[in-house]
Amino acid sequence: AAKVGSVFQNPRTQFFNVDTDSEIAFGIENEARPPQELIERVEQTADDLRIQKLRNRNIFELSGGEKQKIAFASVYAMNPQIYLLDEPSSNLDMTSIQELREHLRLIKKQGKTVLIAEHRLYYLMELADRIVYLEKGEIKGIYTPEEFRQLSEQERERMGLRAVDLRAVFPPKPHSIAPIPVLELRNVTLRYKKRTILHDIGLSAGKGEVIGVVGHNGAGKTTFSRALCGLHKDCDGQFLWESKPIECKERLQRSYMVMQDVNYELFADSVEAECSFGIRNPDQTLVNATLEELGLSPYREQHPNTLSGGQKQRVAVAVSMICGKDLLVFDEPTSGLDFDSMTQVAGLIRRLSNMGKVIFIVTHDFEFVCRTCSRVLHFDEGEMPDDVPVTMDALPKLRELFSVSDGKER
């Protein structure tokens, strides 16, 4: 433990403090370092990792990506010889993933050993020395990055692996039928603790639309999602459904939200029971079919808390299919998912779209957006500067929003 530093997939499970500076300092304190050294190490860590804006913050008010940065910083401050990172990019926006890549490059130059369990591969291809492929508890292959790039797309997908180059990911052909508008937001302003998060937002959404919501960590995407579902009440402006105003209570009745941290919404003693929890007269045939489609049938009797992060995510997505609500909001539904699980979730969302559901997806996953979304909303600096269709014509703008360069990824 003195030589190995671990960053968990869910950073919340490794926090011991309520503010960021104390969390970064926690490990050093337990080494009984002198107070002055402790202060210097915290300051040096914040400078090295460029997280000065996250200092002296309440951990409970951070976004998922910001929590991930603090978890990494708390390990970096202890200066371990070996880093173990479990899905370190799962909660990060594309800019933060670029920063993570630079942090990994930094500790590699320092002579540290880094082991990363990861499904997103593209940001590691210039850094990794070896790529170890595991299947069912066994090592099935060890590759150099160059050997890994030579794998065909079919072979990579058979192995359940994500794209190694986001420049090779393209949107499908657009739908020719315009959706029927049902949801409208007029001059909506959202606040959190008296601070304006989003200002004067206006948009409409139609039946069957799948709308991506993007922006940097802390841009207000989750607050926007909660407001759509009637869970965030500190707002001005109008929400309309089929041209009629709907207040928080009715939005809550019409909607279902899959949270970024699904541990907050798993209540039952088994996966099967979770899929019908709180639903009157659940359709057992639909429950069985959904479990089968998402590869959850083998786990139907297991307690949800015994599942992996990706499996828990699929359970929450399964509930969204079964609950019968009109408005569905997914907050990072592909966090921690491999290629197979991601395509399963994408297929399920397309089915929900075909059923006429209005779907919003908060995501940083360019590959997933190209498979599922019809348009993308971009939040930045409290505003919504972009509403971009997911089409080949708009591909340059989409790549810009997701920081995918025309040359080598930055």
Spans of model-derived segments:
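Conserved ABC ATPase "signature" region
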Residues: 36-54, 284-299
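Conserved ABC ATPase signature
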Residues: 58-62, 66, 303-307, 311
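Catalytic Walker B motif of ABC-type/P-loop ATPase nucleotide-binding domains
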Residues: 83-86, 328-331
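ABC-family nucleotide-binding domains
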Residues: 93, 338
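H-loop/switch region of ABC-family ATPase nucleotide-binding domains
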Residues: 118-119, 363-364
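The feature captures the beta-strand-to-loop junction immediately N-terminal to the Walker
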Residues: 214-216
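Helix-to-loop junction immediately C-terminal to a conserved catalytic motif
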Residues: 229
